[in-house]
């Protein structure tokens, strides 16, 4: 039954509201035939920040990603968000075409009664919270079948695991841009339309070909010509693999129309250290540093600073030792990461632990804030150290 203006005025009097202080237009709400279905969960409300609204209005998509055993996340083209249900104390009404007070002010309305049909209602909505992308699974998938070279028997096995970009977008809880960035970090490349990580021994084989050629030709590490590399090394390995190796360990540039690569000494020294450390549980630090320096190309200088997030030095053992500890092998969850680190070593200096928690920092979070939340600090021999806030089993 539709209300008349007299009934509306009578209601205002009962509520002791002054009509002069209100907009003249009146919404009279009534439930439509579809309201019960909408309230039963056929629809849900999603609160979006202005930039995401603009992306939708521009024709872009937002994607919800996650397997059945994972907490769903929402992804834009370049960001990842947690989805959280927020309950409300007031009923939220779905009213198609409902005009806001600002819209009504712009209209020439004289005591209009607007009969509005409620399409549905809800006591909660989904809200988004920016989060780090869940990228650990990406390396796990690609390491199921690392690329060992064109002559590997595994390449002839049609049942081996391989993933296209679409496969990764379907399985990784991260935005497309974040996935593509991480593929670069992992030094992944496309082979036959599938993303692959090079098996480390094969990667080092390629790198040795390049550094030996640089040495034999007496080139500067800052100016390695691409075309000559491909011509000389092409008979040994596929040209696309040689170029990929140069991209992984150097920076591409053009000089007088020719393509060159400036090799990164830190990356090459780091790779050589990993090669030495991966076959030893622990390595005498002094002996390691001597062998390491001998294993890198002449002219490059090794430094322990090159090994942050790759290896850890134990200064308290006698003799001092070094061992492999890769940050990408540690848990992705904050608390699990700290538990893992504190089970390995009871007390850490900030200098030692920083490379292993840097990737946990959010947009506005610092290493100091993470340490305050997950550890206690104390002084030991004049040096600030950090230990776990909770017992480690």
Curated annotation (Swiss-Prot):
Example of a GO MF term: DNA binding
GO biological process: DNA replication; maintenance of mitotic sister chromatid cohesion; positive regulation of DNA-directed DNA polymerase activity; post-translational protein acetylation; regulation of DNA replication
Location of the protein in the cell: Nucleus
Claim: DNA-binding is one of the keywords in the record: yes
CC annotations in GO: chromatin; chromosome, centromeric region; Ctf18 RFC-like complex; nucleoplasm
Keywords tagged on the record: Cell cycle, DNA replication, DNA-binding, Nucleus
Statement: the UniProt record of this protein carries the keyword Nucleus: yes
Pfam families for this protein: Dcc1
The organism's place on the tree of life at top rank: Eukaryota
Function according to Swiss-Prot or TrEMBL: Loads PCNA onto primed templates regulating velocity, spacing and restart activity of replication forks. May couple DNA replication to sister chromatid cohesion through regulation of the acetylation of the cohesin subunit SMC3.
UniProt subunit comment: Component of the CTF18-RFC complex which consists of CTF8, CTF18, DSCC1 and the RFC complex. Interacts with CTF8 and CTF18. Interacts with DDX11.
PANTHER family linked: SISTER CHROMATID COHESION PROTEIN DCC1, SISTER CHROMATID COHESION PROTEIN DCC1-RELATED
Family from the record: Belongs to the DCC1 family.
Official protein name in the record: Sister chromatid cohesion protein DCC1
Source organism per UniProt: Homo sapiens
């Amino acid at each position: 039954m539709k209300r008349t203006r007299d009934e509306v005025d009578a209601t205002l009097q009962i509520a002791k509201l002054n009509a002069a202080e209100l907009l003249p237009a009146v919404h009279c709400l009534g439930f439509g035939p579809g309201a019960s279905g909408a309230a039963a969960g056929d629809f849900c409300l999603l609160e979006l920040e202005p930039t995401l609204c603009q992306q939708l209005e521009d024709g872009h998509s937002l994607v919800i990603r996650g397997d059945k055993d994972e907490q769903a996340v929402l992804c834009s083209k370049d960001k990842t968000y947690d989805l959280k249900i927020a309950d409300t104390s007031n009923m939220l009404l779905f009213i198609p075409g409902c005009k806001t007070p600002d819209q009504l002010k712009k209209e020439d309305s004289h005591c209009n009664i607007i009969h509005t049909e409620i399409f549905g209602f809800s006591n909660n909505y989904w809200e988004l919270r920016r989060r780090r992308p869940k990228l650990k699974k990406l390396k796990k998938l690609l390491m199921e079948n690392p690329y060992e070279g064109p002559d590997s028997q595994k390449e002839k096995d049609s049942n081996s695991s391989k993933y296209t970009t679409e496969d990764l977008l379907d399985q990784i809880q991260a935005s497309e841009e974040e996935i593509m960035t991480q593929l670069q970090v992992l030094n992944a490349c496309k082979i036959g339309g599938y993303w692959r990580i090079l098996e480390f021994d094969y990667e080092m084989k390629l790198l040795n070909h390049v550094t030996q050629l640089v040495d034999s030709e007496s080139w500067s590490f800052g100016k390695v010509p691409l075309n000559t590399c491909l011509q000389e090394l092409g008979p040994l390995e596929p040209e696309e693999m040689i170029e990929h190796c140069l991209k992984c360990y150097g920076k591409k540039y053009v000089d007088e129309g020719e393509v060159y690569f400036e090799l990164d000494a830190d990356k090459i020294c780091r790779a050589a250290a990993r090669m030495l450390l991966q076959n030893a549980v622990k390595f005498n630090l002094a002996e390691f540093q001597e062998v390491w320096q001998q294993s890198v190309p002449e002219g490059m200088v090794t430094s322990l600073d090159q090994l942050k997030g790759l290896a850890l030095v134990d200064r308290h053992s006698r003799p001092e030792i070094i061992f492999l500890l890769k940050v990408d092998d540690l848990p992705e969850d904050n608390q699990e990461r700290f538990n893992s680190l504190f089970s390995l070593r009871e007390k850490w200096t900030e200098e030692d632990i920083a490379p292993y928690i840097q990737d946990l920092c959010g947009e506005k979070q610092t290493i100091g804030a993470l340490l305050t939340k997950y550890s206690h600090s104390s002084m030991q021999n004049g040096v600030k150290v950090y230990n776990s806030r909770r017992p480690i089993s």
